[in-house]
Amino acid sequence: MLSRLSAVWRPSRVALRIQRVDFTTCGNRLNRSTQPNEPPLVSGIAARSRTAKAEPVEKRGRAAIKIDSPPPPLEPPRISEEHMTRRRKVGGGKTKAAAVTKSKQRRSGRTVGASAFNTARRANGIEGSAPGKGGASDVAIDDDDDEKLVDEESKQLMQLLKEEALRREEEKKKRLRAKAAAEPTEVTDDKEYLSKLGVAERTQPVGTEAKISAQGKAEGASEGQTHFSDADADSQLPILTSLSPEQQRALRLALKGRNLFITGGAGSGKSLLIREIVYQLRHNKRRCVYVTATTGVAALNVRGSTVNSFAGVKFGDGDARQLLKWVRRSRRAAGRWRYCQTLIIDEISMMDPLLLDKLDVIARAIRRRNEPFGGIQVILCGDFLQLPPIPPRNKPQQKTEENAEAQEGGDPTDGTPAPSKLQYCFETSTWTSLNLITVILHKKFRQHDDLAFQQVLDELRVGSLSPESYELLLSRTVASKSSAKSRKKKDEDAGNDGVLPLTDAETTPAAAEKDRHVRLCATNKEVEMRNAKYFAALEPKGLPIYPSPNDGSSQQTGSSNGANSVTEEDTMRPLQVYRAYDAYSTHETEPETTEETTTGTQPSQPWVRFEDSTLPTDLALKVGTRVMVLQNISLRLGLVNGSVGEVVGFLHPLELVELVLRAPRERHFPSARGQELLERAGLPTLQDAFRCVDTALGQSLFYYLRERGIRRPEDASYGCVYGNTHCRDILRLVGLGKTESANAVHPLEMYLGGIAPQHVRLTRLPIVRLDLREGNHTSSDSGAVEDGGFANGSKRLPKHVYAFISPSSHQWYMGDQPVATRTQLPLRQAWAMTVHKAQGLTISHVEVAIHRFFSPGQAYVALSRSTRLDNIRLLDFNNASVHACPRAKEFYTVLEEEELDNEIEDDGTEGDEEALEGDGEYEGEVEE
């Protein structure tokens, strides 16, 4: 009996095993025999895998199994070897976390991505698809067909983006290799320097602080840099070839250990020079460099911290002795002062002069060296003719020029004002003791195409306009509604036949919506009112109701349509709300913080103010919202930080992938799904979808997918296109990051068909239409395009570029260690913004209500954001609105006279380019 059961069981078990064999191998073995009279070439275990009828027979007294003639062989599923090769290539490399999640779900009776996988198999023709119904043989698209789809403008644009992305990737690899090669030497040099300094034997906390500093460097090196955009990475690269002669002179002096004061007008490249100095000092000289600034906005621009946080003096209140006690109680603050070798302070013009004297006293006491700043190399950067210093908390800010002059008091002929009368840092005794070498940057990079505008800005900077410059600014004046009637009546009475002002272009919200100018205001209240006015006029009507940080509910809109109601209006013209995700970096001695902290800051890092970031805390977007892009997309195309565009639609990342991959198959007969995606994205044609730039990838998504061999929407998972970090950031921005559970599908396993519809709707990202500048409409590259086959010469580019905006991050640094991070879409509403927020940006079209400015230099900062005079619009301009501080003007007059003498003296002591080659002995010069 047992033998009979065994005989029946064995063939069945073999047949089950054969069913698990790869379909391609089974098909090749079964289909070798094509003639009916030819015996099948199947042997061994494969022959026994056929379905057969078993009959018991007698053999040697035992029951056996007699196998009749087998039925015709099974027809293998129709599947191409090319598809299987591509699936193995794209689907391989699952992470360990994905494997663990998949194993848990299998044990619980679920299969990861089963529905999406079956959908993909049916769409690929695996499960008996009929010819002409979407099978694999009918929809295969080769490279030649792709080339025919894309026009020449799109090809040229995609090629430029590809070359720029490859260049960034190659430079990033070089930077990582150089950093890895320099790490062991850097530790050795630090130990040697600390032994020379001889402070470890005098103070007990130094050894502990050195250990913590080394651990902090290791943690900073291990921090994930995935949040950095390509523009942030480019800012850390050596750029010696792009520096002007004045900038190269400042770099040589900095590498020789001199104390510097770098100044110049707006757009002269001060921030660019600071980044290059930091890069050279850290990588070539192995120096411990701390980059600081007087404001949080300026600190983010130079990737540093505020000077108050570095010094450990909180708000800087109190006398020097009280601040010194605070610093000595903070082990970290004291350690920063001891090990700092180069201190860079940006926007020195906005620092309280008394604070500079206090910092000098603290540095001398902590370092126990009776030298200016305890022997630290000090590099100051700023322009005293721009925004004035920030007053202390117990002093009101100056409102008018008359109040400023009244507060100055005293005899203007005195060389040294009383301490209570100090207004700028150059009036302090510490400034004189530093023996700063002044480097004035004269070349303007921002307005290099408009020489007349440069002359106007130079005169506006010192507060004295010539008649020609005044007429040029008056020609850009627009009368506001409140003063249009009074000005018209005044001109009629006076018979004024002078320059006629421009017409008011923003009489209605609809007209303002089409306008490209960004209003620069003096206060936050004006900005909020203007942005809310025009945002509420868009469809759907109303303003968003932002949820509290502790509220786990989804975003609600100000209209009747809630976040959970799915209507046609919500789908095509939605109201999307994104809340920034703020987090602190972990440290061994500090509690780990990885949750949202938008309502406050940690006591251990009170200096971090997330509202200082240009990335907004809450970002509400509709179709038609005017936005400003806060990261560089393409330097060659002029799509840089500060470019203004308009939101035209919203798509989920995988929906955009589906749209791009559907286009080749639906170029003749578009489907309803393809038309729906094209309409939801706000793209007029398929060519616009081809050249849509993904900010996460840095190039055209169509080009990127073609290089990866991804041709079908069913083959594109989230992991093979974007990755885990991209998905995690999006979920956090829409409030879904905390809903992850053990049974959730891993982001690398997600296909579009496996995501819940409500999650697809909430996690859609904006598509922004950006206008190329007039100088970027053509490309005159000498090299031929590889794939496109273009000849040498100019090629015309499209006037509009569409960008798919992905999350980005701003980081706060203490030295070279990131301490806090804000993640948000690099966009902000751009109907209006404050002058302080616009500092450091390049805005193409600017509108300025100059009659409302109250601080000296505020009008100059606002107008210098633009690149051309023709792109400026002034409201109620008059000559009284332009003024500069008399003390600052006198200071720069002296600097201009001494500049020539300093250059002659420096030329006699500098010698050759030894500093750039790294041959000089930097440490000896500083310590002596």
Swiss-Prot record:
Transit sequence range: 1-49
Gene Ontology biological process terms, A to Z: DNA recombination; DNA repair; DNA replication, Okazaki fragment processing; DNA replication, removal of RNA primer; telomere maintenance
Pfam families: PIF1 (PF05970), Pif1_2B_dom (PF21530)
InterPro entries: AAA+_ATPase, DNA_helicase_pif1-like_DEAD, P-loop_NTPase, Pif1-like_2B_dom, PIF1_helicase
Mutant lacking the gene: phenotype: Essential, it cannot be deleted.
Assigned protein family: Belongs to the helicase family. PIF1 subfamily.
Protein name as annotated: ATP-dependent DNA helicase PIF5
Organism: Trypanosoma brucei brucei (strain 927/4 GUTat10.1)
